[in-house]
A protein has these predicted regions:
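Cys-nucleophile CN-hydrolase/nitrilase-fold catalytic domain and related Cys-dependent amidase chemistry
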Residues: 26-126, 193-212
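Short, glycine-anchored, charge-dense loop/turn motifs used at functional sites
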Residues: 10, 116-124, 241-249
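Residue-level detector of high-confidence beta-strand sites
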Residues: 113, 126-128, 189, 250, ...
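Acidic/histidine-rich helix-loop elements
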Residues: 18-31, 141
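CN hydrolase (nitrilase-like) catalytic-core segments centered on the catalytic cysteine
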Residues: 75-98, 161, 167-258
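A conserved C-terminal secondary-structure "cap"
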Residues: 268-292
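Short beta-strand scaffold segments in enzyme catalytic cores
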Residues: 99-101, 113-116, 153-155, 238-240, ...
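Active-site catalytic loop in hydrolytic enzyme cores
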Residues: 84, 88, 105-185, 195-208, ...
Length: 292
């Protein structure tokens, strides 16, 4: 008799900003985005999602084109009121969650962070975005975030071992490998990126990480355009990819959407039993990577 398959139902939420008015208070803009997400989080619970991930700094617009200090007001402790609110909703459905927010460690020390909670609402820890871009046409993130200092943690939820790699991180294979070495079965990549800059890479990099490291990835991008900056269209197309590099499920380019997929954890052993990348890697030969 074979063992019962371990299937994990995962969800991604891609969402447009409902209040595109730079003249409104930061707290009001954030509240509108949170209110919009609450209904979608509830829907995920009703649909039986076991692990849910939201988009990069989900509770507001992608404000990095502004280089305005007013957006420092958007930062909060982690864990904090926003992450605890989401975790409380998810707990009612026994749903683990990844909650990306703008973190304030102390005055002047701010991070791009994702909090991870287990299905019973227990706070498991956080991942801080390691790679901080300064890239046209408006990704001025060094104005807002310090580079992460917490390594590449993997969180043991009730359903699976989860890692997080935020947006620009995905351009760097080194951290993706660290997540695999640390035991990740599913890596979530919450993002905010626009057409014309990275859309072709969106279809390449995460499947490559999934194949090279033998895990699933859940990749999220927001949708719509955000005034007043209008740096381009956030092209959505959130998706899940399996350890073979095959797309399991994909969302639209332009609609608010909850994407749900059932992921077979048995495929991880199957793929790693064929492609022995962990056995055959040569860390002693890679010193040049960190020596310069």
């Amino acid at each position: 008799m074979t063992d019962k398959k371990r299937i994990v139902r995962c969800g991604l939420i891609q969402c447009s900003n409902p209040l595109n008015d730079e003249g409104r208070p930061v707290a009001e803009i954030q509240r509108a985005m949170v209110d919009k997400h609450v209904a979608m989080i509830e829907d995920a619970g009703r649909r039986g999602v076991q692990i849910l991930c939201l988009q990069e700094i989900f509770n507001g617009p992608y404000f990095c084109p502004s280089q305005s200090t007013r957006w420092y007001e958007a930062a909060e402790p982690v864990p904090g009121p926003t992450t605890e609110l989401v975790a409380g909703i998810c707990r009612r459905y026994q749903m683990a969650c990844v909650v990306p927010v703008y973190e304030r460690e102390m005055s002047g020390v701010l991070y791009n962070t994702a909090a991870v909670y287990d299905a019973d609402g227990t706070y498991l820890g956080k991942y801080r975005k390691q790679h901080i871009p300064q890239v046209n046409p408006g990704f001025w993130e060094k104005f807002f975030f310090k580079p992460g200092n917490g390594g590449y943690p993997v969180f043991r939820t009730r359903y699976a071992k989860v890692g997080v790699y935020i947006c620009y991180d995905r351009h760097f294979p080194e951290g993706a490998r660290c997540l695999g070495l640390n035991g990740a079965e599913i890596v979530f990549n919450p993002s905010a990126t626009v057409a014309g800059l990275s859309q072709y890479l969106w279809k390449i990099e995460q499947p490559a990480h999934a194949v090279a490291n033998g895990y699933y990835m859940g990749c999220i991008n927001r949708v719509g355009t955000e005034a007043p900056w209008n740096i381009g269209k956030f092209y959505g197309t959130s998706y899940f990819v399996n350890p073979r590099g095959e797309t399991v499920a994909q969302a639209s380019e332009d609609r608010d959407e909850l994407l749900v997929a059932d992921l077979d954890m048995g495929m991880i052993d199957e793929v790693r039993g064929t492609w022995q990348f962990y056995r055959d890697r040569r860390p002693e030969a890679y010193g040049e990577i960190t020596a310069q």
